[in-house]
Design a protein with these regions (language model features):
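Short N-terminal helix-initiation segments at or just after the protein's N-terminus
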Residues: 52-54, 188-194, 212-213, 217
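N-terminal accessory/pre-domain segments preceding catalytic cores
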Residues: 2-167, 255-258, 287, 291-296
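Catalytic cysteine-centered active-site loop
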Residues: 190, 198, 209, 232-239
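Hydrophobic/aromatic-rich core segments of domains that either
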Residues: 214-296
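Secondary-structure boundary elements
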Residues: 144-207, 256, 265, 270-278, ...
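Active-site nucleophilic cysteine motif
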Residues: 171-175, 208-223
Length: 296
């Protein structure tokens, strides 16, 4: 799995001063948060899949569930067209959820079992035509990389943050502001993190520190739970720095910080890790520096 080895650039620590959302009407109604979208493994809908089961009942919602048991390592491979994602899969029978993040098309789902040091054999395969309800579905619910549920502490925290928000842009600003001020970059963790690491939004919230992968996962969890589509993206900043950041979509225009204004009905890239490290907004907003490799 992916390893984020970015380093925070800039000289400040947590001294960035983003503004709250651009609330101009004190009499505006509070933002109405839509129903919580969960990822649920439907036992009645699941079918045999190699040494486990696969739930394909939520394809239009942009998510699948898989669980399997094995004495060896397992991987889940998802292919659509020329794109391919490989994930580690727990071998203890616990359900894990994966996004259908390659748009509409014919998907191939493969369960892979380790047969050598770096060799895997396919022990289960399913093909399905996928038509999503809309492009936002995969980025509105939990998955392996953005792992949370309705009872998660990070979801309780964002409920506190949204109390005075009247638009989705206000909520995005509140989450951005909270994370920049309260989550510190963990340089020790960045130097020792192992390949295959999975972020825990609640752990990041609890410890108040993390690497770029942690920042991006926590932000995505908070925003998704509020009905705001949010991608967790990994790739390169410049030519050598492997990094993680977010892209979110709001229906209302509004200030995210004093220098960043989100446009309505457009995807907006944000890099909270670098913002927390004091990097100037002009550098963070330079899209030419960012190259996407994977999206979750």
């Amino acid at each position: 799995m992916l390893l984020c080895s970015c380093a925070v650039r800039g000289t400040a620590s947590n001294d960035a001063k983003p503004a709250a959302g651009d609330v101009t009407d004190s009499n505006a109604a509070p933002y109405e948060v839509p129903a919580f979208r969960d990822s649920v493994f439907n036992e009645d809908e699941a079918t045999a899949f190699g040494s486990g089961e696969i739930d394909l009942s939520q394809l239009e919602d942009g998510i699948i569930g898989v669980k399997a048991q094995s004495d060896t390592r397992l991987k889940m491979q998802i292919v659509c067209g020329e794109d391919k994602y490989n994930y580690d899969l727990p071998n203890d029978g616990s359900a894990t959820f994966f996004p259908l993040n390659m748009g509409n098309g014919t998907y191939t789902f493969r369960l892979m079992e380790q047969v050598g040091d770096s060799k895997y054999a396919c022990i289960g395969s399913e093909d399905r035509d996928v038509t999503l309800k809309d492009e936002f579905q995969p980025y509105l619910r939990p998955n392996q990389m953005v792992n949370y549920n309705k009872s998660s502490d990070c979801i309780k925290k964002v409920k506190e943050l949204d109390a005075s928000c009247t638009t989705d842009a206000d909520i995005a600003a509140a989450v951005y502001d909270y994370m920049v001020k309260n989550i510190q970059y963990d340089t020790e963790k960045a130097a020792t993190v192992q390949n295959g690491y999975l972020p825990s939004p609640d752990e990041t919230l609890k410890t108040g520190k993390g690497i770029c992968f942690d920042y991006a996962s926590l932000a995505a969890a908070m925003l998704r739970s509020e009905g705001i589509p949010c991608k967790l993206i990994t790739g390169y900043v410049g030519e050598e720095t492997y990094h993680a950041w977010n892209s979110f979509y709001v229906e209302s225009e509004g200030w995210i910080t004093v220098e960043i204004r989100a446009k309505a009905d457009e995807w907006q890239r944000v890099d909270i890790t670098f913002a927390a490290g004091g990097m100037p907004a002009g550098e963070i907003q330079n899209d030419s520096e960012y190259t996407t490799r994977f999206t979750y």
